[in-house]
Amino acid sequence: MTTVVNPVLRGFHPDPCFCQAHGKYYLATSTFQWVPAVSLFESEDLITWTPLGGALPNLDLRGIPDSAGIWAPDLSYDEASDCFWLTYTIARQISGAFKDVSNYVVTARDPRGPWSEPVFVNASGFDPGFFHENGHHYVINPQWDPRPVEGHHKFNGLVMQEFSLEDGLIGEARVVLGNSDAVKWLREGPHVLKHDDWYYIACAEGGTGKQHRIRMARSHELWGPYETCPEPLVCAWMSDSPLRKSGHGNFAQAPDGTWYVSFLCSRYLPERDGSEHVFDENEFGCTTLGRETGMAPIVWRDGWPRLATGGVAAPATFEVAGDAPAPQTSFAYQTDFASGEDLWSSGWLCPRRVAGGWWNVGAEGLTLKGGDSPSSMFERSELVQRACSHAWHAECSVAFEPRHYNQTAGLICEYDSRAFHYLHVGWDENQGCRVVQVLSSGKGVFTMPLGDAGIEIPASVATVRLGVTVDHYDLTFSYAFDDGEWQTVADADGNPLVLDASIMCDELAGFSAYTGTVVGLICVDMWDKSATATFGSFAYRDL
């Protein structure tokens, strides 16, 4: 047996959905405003997960608000046609009474692609899932009710309807699991499976925060009526598990017959004194890494799935058959960009757009053409990697010759357009030279922590190296010129400038914040859009 440590996918990997086909496992996670949309992974043993890139590489999400975009993909395998189905939601707004969502499905013989052109499914709600049986396909999702009057509830039950790729929706949609007995549970993210003589619905409940969980319902008939299990399958608010917000899962069966459940989870920052965060539903906590992907084996008892580890707490570890090497629990990555690697299968993400000629990999490295500011929801020229730990370091090298203070390029650490720390090369007209500067945005405040005077870059310097180190709550920047020694960015008193890394978390980024901390490269030109920056290297490692 091999012990696997949760989360199996660390950092911003929410809403996992996986399936097993031909002896391999395939998993999809939400990407929201980031593209290539819908991150895909492959594994032979549930231990090592290889990124396959995004299923939707050319999706244009310009103008989509933060944490809108691609929600809760459902990846399923139809044995009858030997085909994978991937359905997903495009949410065009995040707040207000309306959701303005559209649901689509794409298909492929191989999860590596190519995937078909999207087929519209419906717009009645979000988080659709597909169930396949005897050549028929059924879509299930929560139906949304925006009417702000008594007697109506926004999460107005789970509805199911037959669907075909050729003819679209077939027959009438039926409510198969209502909210009359538990209006407050906010049921969403449904998946249907069949085991023995039972049909099961697995759905998320309790919202995306500390009360999140997986609830099961079952019926002998696909269309119901369904009875709800009195206890959740997975949750964290009833336990002392370090994996909080646990919920939103689905099931896959291994070739040896063992069943597994996937779920999202979050690891809170420890208290500032180093002690473990103590859970209290009314207490504030920080989850800078966002929601991650966990897994656990299940057993069937009295016709219900139960965690094989016992109880309802998301397990910190679990066992899988075989003698595979223990999984890596820390992550490291580096590139010189000139190696010809596929950026997308290496985990790079962009905000809202991939196409448009704003990036190029050549002999000198990665060149970015100046785009919008870090606060823009339209045309940013930016590539990022997910942060995977509460303590990590990243660095890059950049060649950049700005001519105006509105032209900048460098290393950005962000949660979204509202919460970021940005170390960059810019131009200072008063100093008459290039400078290293810092911009920060968080908690509704936009600041320049170094004040108006940046760190002067000598005219002879060709390449500036920029670094960031995050140690839980504390973030520090560093820089070096060409092959010179690293210097810590200091405040006016000569002390290391220590910034607040915790502003980049679900709880502080703002209402409906669903992503996680990322770090990467950006080039901004709010002057004449002519500036370009060439990044010769990038490296990330957990500490």
Regions found by a protein language model. Give the residues of each.
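Carbohydrate-active catalytic/glycan-binding domains of CAZyme proteins
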Residues: 1-543
